[in-house]
């Protein structure tokens, strides 16, 4: 991603409703996985490290990030060991993990099947892979361009990636469903008018930010228990499947 995108992410990830709401949803899903005590956890492409303190509630966290500035910011949080690394061929940790996470990372990698296969190869026996990606190719916008996405995924396309990577899909659900009509409408209007996506990435006023966070975070129990048929994003939980 561009340097400016990393800086913006570092500036807003602790306060913006989307990051806060997503962390609550992810924490609820992880809690439902019943990981072993002091589980070894890996986050791929951790960026400036906004998820690391949340992950550290569930075990001992390692992470990797290719961008120097983002990696420095992540290490400064003190919640994980963060090393340089890339997907699919540059994971810097030799050991297996009970939980391997990649939150909105796979869409940045040209070889998405190879990336998911490499992450799956780091699973300890009984381990789980937790992934999120942006949904609906028709929602492609300037936001995706600025973030150097290669693609957005339909549910069927993401299921095929997991299968091609040799994994068993335990859960595949949409999320960010409650706000989906508003976000989809905004993206479509922006696209039709040729507008950029900078406004949606800024932190709204405190009242609006709090309201949006509550609406988004309210999905947590439903995502953990079952899921939603459609939304702005997809979440998958997978485990080791057939040998490659």
Predicted regions and their residues:
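Conserved N-terminal segment of class I S-adenosyl-L-methionine
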Residues: 1-103, 113-116, 206, 210, ...
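Short, glycine-/aromatic-enriched active-site segment of Class I SAM-dependent methyltransferases
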Residues: 10-11, 129-151, 155-161
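A short glycine-rich, Lys/Arg-flanked "PGG" loop and its adjoining helix->strand segment in the class I
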Residues: 113-128
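Conserved S-adenosyl-L-methionine
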Residues: 167-177
């Amino acid at each position: 991603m561009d340097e400016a995108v990393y800086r913006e992410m570092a500036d807003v990830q602790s306060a913006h409703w989307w990051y806060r709401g997503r962390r609550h949803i992810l924490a609820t899903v992880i809690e439902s996985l019943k990981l072993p005590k002091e589980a070894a956890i890996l986050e791929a492409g951790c960026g400036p490290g906004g998820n690391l303190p949340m992950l550290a509630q569930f075990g001992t966290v390692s992470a990797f990030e290719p961008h120097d500035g983002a990696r420095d910011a992540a290490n400064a949080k003190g919640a994980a060991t963060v090393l340089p690394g890339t997907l699919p061929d540059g994971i810097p940790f030799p050991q297996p993990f009970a939980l391997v996470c990649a939150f909105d990372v796979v869409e940045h990698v040209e070889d998405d099947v190879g990336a998911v296969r490499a992450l799956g190869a780091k699973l300890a026996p009984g381990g789980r892979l937790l992934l999120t990606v942006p949904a609906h190719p028709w929602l492609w916008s300037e936001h995706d361009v600025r973030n150097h996405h290669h693609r957005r995924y339909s549910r069927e396309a993401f299921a095929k990636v997991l299968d091609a990577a040799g994994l068993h899909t335990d859960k595949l659900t949409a999320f960010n469903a409650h706000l989906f009509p508003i976000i989809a409408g905004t993206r479509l209007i922006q696209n039709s008018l040729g507008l950029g996506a900078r406004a949606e990435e800024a932190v709204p006023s405190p009242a609006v930010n709090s309201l949006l966070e509550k609406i988004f975070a309210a999905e947590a129990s439903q995502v953990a228990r079952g899921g939603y048929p459609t939304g702005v994003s997809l979440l998958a939980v997978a485990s080791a499947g057939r040998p490659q």
